[in-house]
Structures are given as C-alpha cells and as structure tokens.
Amino acid sequence: MAATLTWILLFVGLLAGLRDTKAQQTTLYPLVGRVFVHPLEHATFLRLPEHIAVPPTVRLTYQAHLQGHPDLPRWLRYTQRSPYSPGFLYGTPTPEDRGRQVIEVTAYNRDSFDTTRQRLLLLIEDPEGPRLPYQAEFLVRSHDVEEVLPSTPANRFLTALGGLWELGELQLLNITSALDRGGRVPLPIEGRKEGVYIKVGSATPFSTCLKMVASPDSYARCAQGQPPLLSCYDSLAPHFRVDWCNVSLVDKSVPEPLDEVPTPGDGILEHDPFFCPPTEATGRDFLADALVTLLVPLLVALLLTLLLAYIMCCRREGQLKRDMATSDIQMVHHCTIHGNTEELRQMAARREVPRPLSTLPMFNVRTGERLPPRVDSAQVPLILDQH
C-alpha cells in the first residue's frame, strides 16, 4: 500500500513538472530596418503573482537560440550585465530576414536550479510610413549598451537630439556596443563605460550643425587633437557624452548609380598602338639538333671504351717478361711455397703419411736439394748458415 502511494505521488509530481516546464509563447512584430529590443524580465520567468515583487537576491541567467539552430540569427544579439539584472534581445532585421522566426529562451535560476522556457514568435515585416534616407550614427561614450536599450533612455536620447536635428521625426535604426566595433574593454574604474553606437534616421535632411560636425575640416581638427567644429549648442550634454569626432552621416536620398553591365564583344581586338601581337614563327628542322644531341655523347662513350680496352689488353707486360725480371732465388722461394701448399693439401686428404720433406733436417729449404741418407742427421746444424 505504501509503495502504491509513493508511485502515485511521483506520477503527480511528474505531471506537475511537465505542466510547469511547458514553454510560453509570445508574438512580437519587428520591423525591417528598425531597432528591435525585447527585455527578458525576471518577473516574466518566475511567474510570480502581480502583487509580489521580484526579490532583489534572485539570480537568473538566460540562453536564447533560434529554433532548430544552436545560436541566434545573425541580426539578433543578447546581452546581460549580471544575473541580478534583466537580459536583452536586440538588433535590426534586414530585408533578407523578413518572415517568421522562432526564438527559444531558457531561464536558469542559479539559486533553486529551476528552468523556465519561453518561445518568442517573431513576425518580421516591412515598416509603414515614409523612408528614412538621412541616417546619422553617434558614439555615446557615457553609457553601456544595456543602459540605452530600455525605452526611457532611448526616447530621452531622441528628444535631446531633436535640438540639433530640428525638423522631422527621429527614429532609432540600430544600437551596437562599441565592443562589437573593435572597442576596448574599459578599466574597472568608476565612471568608465564601454560605449555604444546609436544610429538615428529621419525623412528630413541634416541640419547645418550636423553637416559642419561631419565635414572634412572638422575631421582634420580632430586628427590634430583639436575640438571639432560644433556651431550649435550640445543639447545631448550632460546626460549623453557624445564623441563628436566619430559622427558619420549617410545620405540615401540620391539613388546610387547602377553598375554598368559590360557588353560582350566579338573577341577581336581593335587597333591599339600599345598592343603588339606576336609575329608568326617560321618552321624549323630539328633533325640536325637531334643528331648532335644523340651522336656526340655516343661517340665520346665509344672512344673512352676503346681507350680503356687498349690500356687493359695491349699494355700488359706478360708472364715471360715478368719471370725473366725476377731473380732465381725468389722464383725458387715462390715455387717452394706453392709446393708446400700442395703437399699440405694432400696431407689433409689422408691421415697416415710420412713427414713432409720440408720438416726433415736433410732438406735444404733454399736450394731444394736433399742430403745423402748416410749423413748423420745429428751432425746437421739446424741453421745451415752456422757451418
């Protein structure tokens, strides 16, 4: 009975866990060419009642990716300063990204190790209203990217920029961290920020003040370490510290000329004084060159062979001339060596043989003669030179 109750409790807990882990779905409508910002608030993933605030000690981190892919799409970025602060998904979709995209977000509770999933259905559409051909980009060094992404500071920047760009309605086109543009990580000193690039667009032309700031003369002064040419009051200060030496203006009101398509020709070059075509080469007979290349090495090899044969065959002294030039004593000694060698070979062939003559005392090694047997061998000196 107790085992059955335990299994029932486990099954109920499993169903509750499956119900809690079911992903929520939110539909969003980003616009092509306009900045898109979606905050990932802790309250959304903790599912707390409305009257209960999120505890400040709760730590949540997020992981977002495109459905069916390990990472986010190329136009979308994610940032979160710390687990105590909310995360942000931001970016500017391009015309190639138009359509439907599903972003899966997983929240991790670092204290209780709970996970919560959320699906963001992005329906990317074209913006309504007039085009924004006049675009200006500013580098704000007094803020980090997550400090500008909320709507309040972004609207405050547009309102302050209206003092420099009086006419027309301003809209945010893109927000990029300076670190993504090759900026350096600031030192851990109070007041140092990473910096953020903010691109703003409008349907009205640039003001005279902005044109003067982005003029070549102003850039030349910045290169020399002097302040830029700012003829109007800086309405962005002191809330936004803009680097006026990094202001870029883009005018897309004039359509760019289309690249001329090259027309294919007939393949025949016209008369050109700088083009010298190669002359026609006359026919050549390579038989003589081939004979010289083959016959000369063969003749040289044949002459060397004949010379070597003459030296080896015709320049020998001969055995008779060699024997006549050799002394008799040396010849006898040579013959004795050969005779002794043959005698030793015969002795090795059979065991019981008489003593060799060369070992007998009556045998003269030099002359080869033998003493008479009647001579007493005891009186024969061992060394013949002694008598």
UniProtKB/Swiss-Prot annotation:
Residues 24-290 are extracellular. GO terms for cellular component: cell-cell junction; cytoplasm; cytoskeleton; membrane raft; sarcoglycan complex; sarcolemma. Pfam families: Sarcoglycan_2, Sarcoglycan_2_C. It is a single-pass type I membrane protein. Residues 312-387 are cytoplasmic. GO terms for molecular function: calcium ion binding. InterPro entries: Cadg, Cadherin-like_sf, Ig-like_fold, Sarcoglycan_alpha/epsilon, Sarcoglycan_C, Sarcoglycan_N. Residues 1-23 form the signal peptide. Glycans are attached at residues 174, 246. The chain crosses the membrane at residues 291-311. It comes from the Eukaryota. Strongly expressed in skeletal and heart muscle. Its main location: membrane. It is found in: Cell membrane, Sarcolemma; Cytoplasm, Cytoskeleton. The keyword Glycosyltransferase does not apply. The keyword ATP-binding does not apply. The modification Phosphoserine is found at residue 377. Keywords: Cell membrane, Cytoplasm, Cytoskeleton, Glycoprotein, Membrane, Phosphoprotein, Signal, Transmembrane, Transmembrane helix. Belongs to the sarcoglycan alpha/epsilon family. Interacts with the syntrophin SNTA1. Cross-link to form 2 major subcomplexes: one consisting of SGCB, SGCD and SGCG and the other consisting of SGCB and SGCD. The association between SGCB and SGCG is particularly strong while SGCA is loosely associated with the other sarcoglycans. PANTHER family: ALPHA-/EPSILON-SARCOGLYCAN FAMILY MEMBER (PTHR10132), ALPHA-SARCOGLYCAN (PTHR10132:SF16). Component of the sarcoglycan complex, a subcomplex of the dystrophin-glycoprotein complex which forms a link between the F-actin cytoskeleton and the extracellular matrix. This is Alpha-sarcoglycan. The gene is SGCA.
